[in-house]
Regions:
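Conserved ATP-binding/catalytic motifs of P-loop helicase motor domains
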Residues: 1-939
Length: 939
C-alpha cells in the first residue's frame, strides 16, 4: 500500500532517517537511488548517499550543481518533499527479512518501482486562471528511493520511501514549477493495487501460496502469504500498535479522527527520536527470538515448500478481461462517470496476483466505454453506452414532449383558500401545464407536500387516475400518512401493480423525493409514461441526497433538459426567523454560511472528546428525559457515530428508567453489496445471512437462510433438510452479517428492510413495547419474530439519508464531518430548533464537500462540434448494444438504435438544436474500438 506525508524542513531527514534502516549501525547505511523522469531531466542518476549535495540542493529549492533557484517560489513553510511510502504486506516482510528470503526483497523493489512509475504519471502543477484553480498534468518527478527492512520498533517491515522533490518540469512553459500532489493522491489506490498485484504475482512465482484479506464488509483489501498466521503478523506489528495507540489517545482527547497530517505528526511523535544502536544480525536474532520453536519450524517449512515450488507453477491464464468486466459492472452500478485509474484499480483488486499490467492496459482499450475527456486512458473519465443513452433519451423525451398535452388539471381548478399566494400559483402552474413531464421544485420545508395534496385532490375530482410513488419506503409512508395512496418507486417499476396497468393510460404518475431517483429508475418511469401516454409530476430538491444507484436523475434533467420547473421558495417549516435564514443558505448551496448562521444562534457546539455527551444532554432535555423521543430527531451521518451516540444515550435512558431490562437479539447488518460482489463466492463466509427479496429457483420471497459453506466457486446455505446451492447470479437476495443487539421495552428500532410478516417497512422507526424470547412487540401492536427477521438497528438516531422526508420539532445533529448535502438535509428537519454537536467546529466548517456526482452529459456542450472519429466510435458503441439490449428499457434501446441509424450530419444538426445539450469534449478520443466489431466486454 501507499501513504503520503509532507516534509516541510527535512534538514536531517536524509542522514538520520533515509540513510539508516530505522536503526543505527556505524558500518551500515541505506543507499538510495534516483528515480523519475524529472530526475533524468536534471541528469540525476545512480546512488544517493548520506549528505548527497544534489538531494540537499533540492531540499533548498536549488538546481543541483548551482545556486540557481529551481522553482520560482522560496516561501517560508514551503513543502520541501512529498514522502510516498510503499509498504509490503506483513507476511512478506516476515518471510523476506526474518526468514531470509532475498527473492522477496527483489520482488518488492521491482513492484514498488513499477507502482511508483504509474503514480508518476499523475504528477501535475497548478495552472490557476481567472475561472478558478486547475491542475496541469506534467507526469514527471524528481525522487529518491530508499528501501528499509525494519520498523522503528525493529519489527520486520519492508518499505520504500519515494522522497519526491516539490518540483516538476512543465513542458508548456519550459520551466520547473511546484509540484501539486492532488492528482497523485487521487490515484494512490491505483498505485497501491499495482504494487499489491505485482507483489502477489511474484509471491506465486516464488512458490508461495497467497490468501486474500477482506474487511468487515467482505471487500478485498490486499493479500498475505498463506501459512503466516494472523497471530504472528500481529506480534510483528508493534510499531503499528504504537501509532494506533497514539490515534486512540488523539480520539479520546479531541473526539474525532485525526487528519492525514495529524496522523503523520502522531507517527513522528510516537517513535523514538534516537535510533536504536544495533546491527542487522542482532535485529534478525531479536526477531527470531520472538518465535517459538514450533512457529519457527513452521515458517521454515513454508519457505522450504515455496523454494521447491518456485518456477514450477504453470501461470494461470490472464484474467484481465474478466477483471475489467467485473470492475465496470461494480463501479457503474453506483456511478455514472468513473476515471480510468479507478476502473484499473478495481480490476486489479478483483483478482490480485492474476493480472499482467500491460495486458490490462491493452484490454482496457477494448471495453467499449465512452470516453468523455481528451486524455490518455488512465486519466480519462468514462461513461457506459447504457448510461449515456439513459441520460440522452430522458433529456430528449422531456424536451420533445413539452407543450404536447392538454392542461393537466382541466379548466375549472378550485384550490383551497388556505394556500399562500405562492403555493396557489405553484399549484395552478402545475395543473395548467401542457408538458408531459413537470417538476414541482423547492427547498426543504417550503410546503411541497401541502401543494401536492391540493393537486392530488384536483386530479381526483377531475376523474384522473393518479399513481403516487417515492424512491424510499419511508418517503412513501410519509405520502400515505398525508392521505395519498402510495408505493415505492421500485415496486411500481417492478410490475407489482400490473393488475392496474390498464388504468395507466392518461394517468398522472407522481414521484415524490425525486432527487433520490437514479438514472435507471427515472428513465424507466418516463418509458412507462411514453408507453401509456401518462403524465409525470416530479417533486423534489436536487440539492438534497441522491440515489445510491448510479445517476442523479433529477439534477440531470434540471441541468440538461428544458424541464418545466415550478418553484416554491418561501420556507415555512422553521418557526424561528434566524433558523429559517440559516436553512435558506443551506438550501442555496452555501453550507458554510448556513452553519455559521446556526452558530450565531449558539446552536453549533464544540465538545471535543465530550461532544457525544453534549448531544445526549440536549436529546434528553428536548425529549423530556427521553419520555417524548418522537419530538426529537437525532441525526448521525456515519454508522460509527450512530453506534457511539446510541450507546451513550441508552445508558442514560436506562438510568432514568425509560428503558426496561434488555434481551440480546441476533440482528443483521446489511452489507449493501453490488451485484458483482453478490455474485462472487469468494466474498462469502459461513454464518452470513441471505434474505430473498423476490422468488428464485428453490427459494421463496421473504425466505432467510444461513451460509453453511463455500466450495468450488459455489455458496451453500443450510436447510431445511439438505443444503441448497445459492443462486448467486439471480439478483434475488441480499446479504448480511449477524451481530448482537440489546433490545428493551422503550427502545426505538430503525427498520432496514421490508418484512411482510410483521408489516414493517425499510426506513421506518418503531417503538418497542416489549420483548420476550426473541419476539418483539411494537407499541402499535405489530410483532417482529427475530428468529425470522433481523434487519434492524437502534433507532434513536438515523443517518442523514434516512432523515430525508422527516419533520420534527427539534433536531440534534451529531457529526465530526458533514457534506453540504448532509448538512442541508439534517439541519432542515426541525420546526423549532437544530443543535449541531461536533468535536471540532473549525474542522467541520472547513470541510464541506458538495457531494455531487458527475453525469455523462456534464461533459458535453454545444461550443464544440463532434469530431468525426469520435462520432464514429460513439455510433459503433450504440450499434454494439445488440447483444445486451435487454438490459435497457425499450425506449432507451430505441434511442441507441436511432443513434446508430442516423447519419453523422443529421445527428450533429439534431444536437445543435439544443445548445445546452451539446458536446464539450470529443467522445472516446483515446479509446481503441473498431467500429466493425464493437466492444469485446459486456457492460
Amino acid at each position: 500500500m501507499f501513504t503520503m506525508a509532507k516534509i516541510k524542513d527535512g534538514g536531517t531527514y536524509l542522514k538520520n532517517h533515509l540513510s539508516a534502516n530505522d536503526y543505527y549501525s556505524e558500518k551500515e547505511t541505506v543507499i538510495g537511488q534516483w528515480v523519475g523522469r524529472g530526475a533524468e531531466h536534471l541528469g540525476l542518476r545512480g546512488e544517493i548517499a548520506a549528505g548527497d549535495p544534489a538531494f540537499e540542493a533540492l531540499r533548498k529549492n536549488r538546481r543541483p550543481g548551482s545556486s540557481e533557484k529551481l522553482t520560482p517560489r522560496d516561501g517560508e513553510g514551503r513543502v520541501r518533499f512529498f514522502d510516498f511510502q510503499c509498504s509490503a504486506q506483513k507476511s512478506v516482510s516476515i518471510m523476506a527479512v526474518t526468514m531470509g528470503d532475498t527473492g522477496l526483497l527483489a520482488a518488492h523493489d521491482a513492484a514498488a518501482a513499477l507502482a511508483f512509475g504509474e503514480l508518476e504519471r499523475f504528477a501535475a502543477r497548478q495552472a490557476n486562471t481567472y475561472a478558478g484553480r486547475a491542475n496541469q498534468r506534467t507526469s514527471n518527478v524528481v525522487a529518491g528511493a530508499f528501501r528499509h527492512t525494519a520498523s522503528r520498533a525493529l519489527d520486520p517491515q519492508v518499505h520504500t520511501h519515494f522522497v519526491t522533490a516539490n518540483a516538476t518540469w512543465d513542458l508548456g512553459t519550459k520551466s520547473w514549477l511546484a509540484l501539486t500532489e492532488f492528482e497523485m493522491v487521487s490515484a494512490i489506490r491505483y498505485a497501491g493495487k499495482v504494487y499489491q498485484n505485482e507483489m502477489a504475482r511474484s509471491c506465486l512465482a516464488l512458490g508461495y501460496d497467497i490468501e486474500h484479506i477482506r474487511d468487515q464488509k467482505g471487500a478485498v483489501t490486499g493479500f498475505e502469504i498463506a501459512g503466516v498466521s494472523a497471530d504472528i503478523r500481529e506480534r510483528f506489528s508493534k510499531r503499528r500498535a504504537e501509532v494506533e495507540a497514539g490515534i486512540a489517545e488523539f480520539r479520546a482527547e479531541y473526539g474525532r479522527e485525526p487528519t492525514p497530517a495529524e496522523i503523520h505528526t502522531i507517527t513522528t511523535e510516537t517513535r523514538n527520536a534516537k535510533l536504536a544502536e544495533v546491527t542487522t544480525p542482532e535485529v534478525l536474532a531479536a526477531q527470531r527470538s520472538q518465535l517459538s520453536s514450533v512457529e519457527l519450524a513452521h515458517l521454515e517449512a513454508v519457505r522450504t515448500q515455496a523454494s521447491a515450488q518456485a518456477g514450477q507453477r504453470v501461470p494461470a491464464p490472464g484474467r484481465e478481461t474478466q477483471s475489467l468486466a467485473a470492475s465496470i459492472s461494480h463501479l457503474y452500478e453506483r456511478q455514472s462517470v468513473v476515471p480510468g485509474h479507478a476502473i484499473l484499480a478495481e480490476a486489479l483488486n478483483q483478482n490480485l496476483g492474476e493480472i499482467e499490467l500491460r495486458r490490462l492496459h491493452a484490454k482496457a482499450n477494448e471495453t467499449g466505454l465512452v470516453g468523455l475527456t481528451d486524455e490518455p486512458w488512465v486519466h480519462q473519465k468514462f461513461a457506459t453506452v447504457e448510461g449515456l443513452a439513459l441520460e440522452k433519451w430522458a433529456v430528449d423525451f422531456v424536451d420533445r414532449t413539452r407543450g404536447q398535452c392538454e392542461p393537466l388539471g382541466g379548466e375549472n381548478v378550485q384550490l383551497s383558500p388556505r394556500l399562500s399566494a405562492e403555493q396557489r400559483h405553484a399549484a395552478e402552474a402545475v395543473l395548467v401545464s401542457q408538458d408531459q413531464v413537470v417538476c414541482l421544485r423547492g427547498a426543504a420545508g417550503v410546503g411541497k407536500s401541502t401543494v401536492l395534496r391540493e393537486i392530488y385532490g384536483e386530479l381526483a375530482n377531475a376523474g384522473v387516475s393518479v399513481f403516487c410513488c417515492a424512491p424510499t419506503s419511508s418517503a412513501a409512508d410519509t405520502l400515505r400518512k398525508d392521505g395519498l395512496a402510495a408505493t415505492t418507486l421500485s415496486a411500481f417499476l417492478s410490475g407489482s401493480l400490473n393488475h392496474e396497468q390498464e388504468n395507466l393510460r392518461g394517468a398522472v404518475i407522481i414521484c415524490d423525493e425525486a432527487g433520490l431517483t437514479s438514472n435507471r429508475q427515472g428513465a424507466e418511469l418516463l418509458a412507462i409514461a411514453e408507453q401509456h401516454e401518462a403524465r409525470v409530476l416530479f417533486l423534489g430538491d436536487s440539492r438534497q441526497h441522491t440515489a445510491v444507484e448510479a445517476g442523479d436523475f433529477l439534477r440531470v434533467l434540471e441541468s440538461h433538459s428544458k424541464l418545466h420547473r415550478v418553484q416554491l421558495t418561501a420556507i415555512r417549516r422553521q418557526e424561528n426567523k434566524a433558523y429559517r435564514a440559516a436553512v435558506r443558505c443551506l438550501a442555496g448551496g452555501a453550507a458554510r454560511v448556513g452553519l455559521e448562521r446556526l452558530d450565531d444562534l449558539g446552536w453549533v457546539k464544540e465538545g471535543r472528546a465530550g461532544y457525544l455527551r453534549g448531544a445526549v444532554d440536549d436529546f434528553m432535555r428536548l425529549s423530556g428525559d427521553g419520555r417524548s423521543p418522537g419530538q426529537v430527531l437525532a441525526v448521525t451521518p456515519t454508522w460509527a457515530e450512530h453506534e457511539a451516540f446510541t450507546g451513550e444515550l441508552r445508558a442514560r435512558l436506562k438510568a432514568k428508567g425509560v428503558l426496561g431490562p434488555g434481551e440480546t437479539i441476533a440482528a443483521h447488518e446489511p452489507l449493501k453489496w453490488t451485484a458483482v460482489q453478490t455474485r462472487n463466492a469468494r466474498n462469502y463466509e459461513p454464518g452470513m445471512i441471505v434474505t430473498f427479496n423476490q422468488p428464485a429457483k428453490g427459494f421463496k420471497a421473504g425466505e432467510r437462510s444461513e451460509v453453511s459453506r463455500i466450495a468450488d466457486g459455489s455458496v451453500f446455505v443450510a436447510g431445511p433438510g439438505a443444503e441448497r446451492r445459492l443462486p448467486l447470479r439471480s439478483g434475488a437476495f441480499s446479504v448480511a452479517r449477524t451481530r448482537e443487539l440489546e433490545v428493551a421495552a422503550g427502545d426505538r428500532l430503525l427498520i432496514r428492510a421490508n418484512d411482510r410478516g410483521s408489516g414493517v417497512l425499510n426506513g421506518e422507526v418503531v417503538t418497542v413495547a416489549g420483548v420476550k424470547a426473541g419476539m418483539i412487540e411494537t407499541a402499535d401492536g405489530r410483532r417482529i419474530d427475530t428468529g425470522r427477521f433481523g434487519e434492524f438497528s437502534h433507532g434513536f438516531a438515523v443517518t442523514s439519508h434516512a432523515s430525508q422526508s422527516k419533520t420534527v420539532e427539534h433536531v440534534v445533529v451529531v457529526a465530526e464531518r458533514l457534506t453540504a448535502k448532509a448538512a442541508y438535509v439534517a439541519c432542515s428537519r426541525g420546526r423549532a430548533s437544530c443543535v449541531v454537536h461536533t468535536p471540532d467546529k473549525a474542522a467541520l466548517l472547513d470541510r464541506l464537500p458538495n457531494g455531487n456526482r458527475e453525469a455523462a452529459l456534464d461533459f458535453l456542450g454545444a461550443e464544440h462540434s463532434l469530431a468525426k472519429t469520435a462520432l464514429d466510435r460513439t455510433l459503433a458503441w450504440a450499434k454494439a448494444l445488440g447483444g445486451r439490449a435487454t438490459m435497457l428499457p425499450k425506449a432507451v434501446r430505441e434511442v441507441a438504435e436511432r443513434m446508430w441509424r442516423r447519419k453523422h450530419a443529421t445527428l450533429e444538426a439534431k444536437w445543435a438544436e439544443t445548445p445546452h445539450q451539446g458536446w464539450n469534449h470529443h467522445i472516446g478520443h483515446s479509446t481503441n474500438i473498431h467500429a466493425d466489431r464493437g466492444p469485446s466486454l459486456g457492460l
